[in-house]
Design a protein with these regions (language model features):
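Conserved strand-to-loop turn within each blade of WD40 beta-propeller repeats
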Residues: 38-41, 78-82, 120-123, 167-170, ...
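Per-blade loop-tip surfaces of WD-repeat and WD-like beta-propellers in eukaryotic adaptors/scaffolds
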Residues: 2-8, 30-32, 46-63, 87-105, ...
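Structural WD40 beta-propeller signal
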Residues: 25, 70-72, 111-113, 159, ...
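Beta-strand-rich domains and repeat architectures in extracellular enzymes and scaffolds
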Residues: 11-42
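C-terminal, well-structured subdomains that either form a transmembrane helix-short loop-helix hairpin
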Residues: 279-289
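Conserved blade-ending motifs and adjacent loop-strand segments that build the rim/top face
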Residues: 230-236, 267-280
Length: 321
C-alpha cells in the first residue's frame, strides 16, 4: 500500500514578528488572486497567488491586526495598534486614507465597491467611513448606549451591499443593516469569539469560539442552516474549502500544527512545520491551497492535493489554476 503524499509547505518569508491575520482576494479576471498578511511588525505584505512577494505597505507605527483586500484587488485596508485604520492602493503601495481611532483597531472590512470602510477594535465601537468623503466624521453602529459590543471587537465583515457582521470578546455575533444602522440579529456564545471570517464563495461565516467551530449563513434569511462542531481543542482560526465545502482547516494557540478536518469534524491530517502557535489559516479562493500564519513570523502555503502541479509546486504550472 503506497504512503499518501504529504503536503510540503512553501514558506513565505519577510515578516519579523508574529503573523496576526491572512486574507486572500477573490479570483480576478486574469485567473490570479492576491494574498495579504498582517503582522506585529507593523508592515502588511502583499503577495501573488504563488506566494511571491509583491510589496510592503509602509506607514503604520504599531502592530497590524487585520488587513483585507477589496473584491477587485485594487485596494487594501488595515487596522493597527497605532490607533489608525488605513486604506492603500495595491498597485502603487501608497496610503490613500488614514483614519484615527481612540484605541487599537482589531479588524477592518471594505464594502464590495470599496467605497466604505468598516472598523472595530478595543474601543468596542463599530465605525463606518465613507471613502468618498474621507474628511467627514464616521458613522457609528450602536447596540446599547455608546457601544457596539461589550468586549473588544475581534472581527468585522461586510456581506453583500448592506449588511455588516461583527464579533467580539463578549461572545456575540451581530448583524447590522448598514442603511438604517440598526442591529437586526444577535447570536450569543458562552466563550469569546476568537475569529470570524467570511467565506465568500460559500456565503458562510466561519466562527471559532472556545472549542467550537460554527459555519453560519452570512445572511440570516438565506434558508441555509448553521453547522456546529465541537473539537477536542480550541481553534484560533478556521477556514472552509470554498468549493467542495467538505473540509476545513484550523490553527491553534495550544500547539504548532495546522489541522485538516472533514466537515463532520473528523481529523484528516496534522501538518507540522511551524515553530510557534498558529494564529490564522485561510483557504485560497480556488481551494487548491491554504495559508497559515504563526507566532514564528512565517506564512506557510499548503497544497490541498499534494503532488499536483500548482504554482511553485513541481515547477510553475502553465495555466495556474
Amino acid at each position: 500500500m503506497s504512503t499518501p503524499l504529504r503536503s510540503t509547505p512553501l514558506v513565505a518569508p519577510g515578516h519579523t514578528r508574529p503573523i496576526t491575520h491572512l486574507s486572500f482576494s477573490p479570483i480576478q479576471d486574469d485567473s490570479s488572486f492576491l494574498l495579504v498578511s498582517s503582522c506585529k511588525d507593523g508592515n502588511p505584505m502583499l503577495r501573488e497567488w504563488t506566494g511571491d512577494w509583491i510589496g510592503t505597505f509602509l506607514g503604520h507605527k504599531g502592530a497590524v491586526w487585520s488587513t483585507k483586500l477589496s473584491l477587485d484587488g485594487s485596494r487594501a485596508a488595515s487596522g493597527s495598534a497605532d490607533f489608525t485604520a488605513k486604506v492603500w492602493d495595491t498597485y502603487s503601495g501608497n496610503c490613500l486614507h488614514s483614519f484615527p481611532h481612540n484605541h487599537i483597531v482589531r479588524s477592518v472590512a471594505l464594502s464590495p465597491q470599496a467605497t466604505h470602510l468598516l472598523t472595530g477594535g478595543q474601543e468596542k465601537k463599530i465605525r463606518i467611513f465613507d471613502l468618498n468623503r474621507p474628511d467627514a466624521e464616521p458613522e457609528y453602529l450602536f447596540d446599547s448606549g455608546l457601544l457596539s459590543h461589550d468586549g473588544t471587537i475581534k472581527s468585522v465583515v461586510w456581506v453583500g451591499d448592506h449588511t455588516g457582521v461583527t464579533a467580539g470578546d463578549d461572545g456575540k455575533v451581530k448583524w447590522w443593516d448598514l442603511r438604517s444602522r440598526e442591529l437586526t440579529k444577535t447570536i450569543a456564545y458562552s466563550d469569546p469569539i476568537t475569529s470570524m471570517e467570511l467565506s465568500l464563495p460559500t456565503q458562510r461565516l466561519v466562527v471559532t469560539s472556545g472549542k467550537n467551530v460554527e459555519f453560519i449563513p452570512a445572511l440570516p434569511h438565506s434558508g441555509h442552516n448553521t453547522h456546529s462542531l465541537t473539537l477536542r481543542y480550541a481553534p484560533s482560526s478556521a477556514s472552509i474549502h470554498p468549493i467542495l465545502q467538505d473540509r476545513f482547516v484550523t490553527g491553534s494557540m495550544s500547539d504548532e500544527w495546522v489541522r485538516v478536518h472533514s466537515i463532520n469534524g473528523e481529523e484528516r491530517d496534522v501538518l507540522k512545520g511551524h515553530h510557534g502557535p498558529v494564529h490564522c489559516v485561510e483557504f485560497s479562493p480556488d481551494g487548491e491551497m491554504y495559508a497559515s500564519g504563526s507566532e514564528d513570523g512565517t506564512i506557510r502555503l499548503w497544497q490541498t492535493t499534494p503532488g499536483k502541479t500548482y504554482g511553485l509546486w513541481q515547477g510553475t504550472s502553465t495555466n495556474g489554476h
